[in-house]
Amino acid sequence: MKSNILYLKYGLSIAAALIAYFLIIRVLGMHDNHWLRILNGVIVAYGIYAVIKKKKDQEKEAFEYFSGFWLGILTGAVATVTFVAFMAVYLFHIEPAFAERLLKHIAGSIGGPEILLLILTIEGISSSVILSLTFMQKFKVSRNITKKHAHA
């Protein structure tokens, strides 16, 4: 499967999982609990890990560090943009009062719902970069000489 298909498939899957999780905690009346956002990170981390692993499994020895790293970032970007678009609709049209409650807790009285969308975008992109770098440490092909071969 080509990388552009992978990042779209996994990015949209991550976004769907984030949206489903948000709607579930919304139905349960727990969407005001900010600590439940931690699971968002777990969902994104799993998706980025899975897409990089899939690419490495496909390419085997031809797998390159930069292509895996970039794939993780693109996957996270697709997930972020999709989720932020959903949240924009939710905050502006479905439950504007939720945005007001979040603003009081997070940003004080600065800005409107747009600041929340900016925060979500920055969080999503930055966590995608950090997670991609982290997972590539596991998946990168080592070019180091092993101790066994160094003494031969």
Question: What are the roles of these predicted feature ranges?
Answer:
Residues I5, K9-S13, L36-N40, F66-T75, ...:
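Alpha-helical transmembrane segments of integral membrane proteins
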Residues G72-V89:
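Hydrophobic alpha-helical membrane-insertion segments
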Residues A97-I115:
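Short, membrane-exposed interhelical loops at transmembrane-helix boundaries
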Residues K138-A152:
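Cytoplasmic juxtamembrane regions at transmembrane-helix boundaries
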